[in-house]
Amino acid sequence: MTAKLDRTAIAPKNPLLNASRRSNLPHVPGIRVGDYLFLSGMAPVDPQTGERSHGPIAEQVRITLSNMQHMLESAGSSLARVVRIHVVLADIAQMAEMDRVYREFFPVDPPARTVWSMQLRFGNGCEIECVALAGADDGQRA
């Protein structure tokens, strides 16, 4: 007997942040499975215009993590509930600058993290995805 996978697509309240609405890609911004939220890789998209930022890496990381925060809050969770994060940088030499901004969003007790470097689509300097616990922030990840 195969167990049914109960998953629900989640989307940001701001439609400008939903890449699947702007393209014909087979993409959802995130899904909820049980007590977990899985957010797809997010790019530095300006929430006011829907345009990609190609500014300094600090700006791109800040926009991307702010969008991730918005997405988690749209799903009833928060950055404090993130248990795993994956950062891709187009240029690994920018890791120190990325870390500086990252610490603004995760100042204490950061989640598990992996950082890779590779060429990214559309000239993006970063792409970030995460896994978080669903539900309101109770100060706990467990």
Question: Residue locations for each model-derived region?
Answer:
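N-terminal presequence-like segments and the immediate start of the first folded domain
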Residues: M1-S66, H70-A80, L89-A142
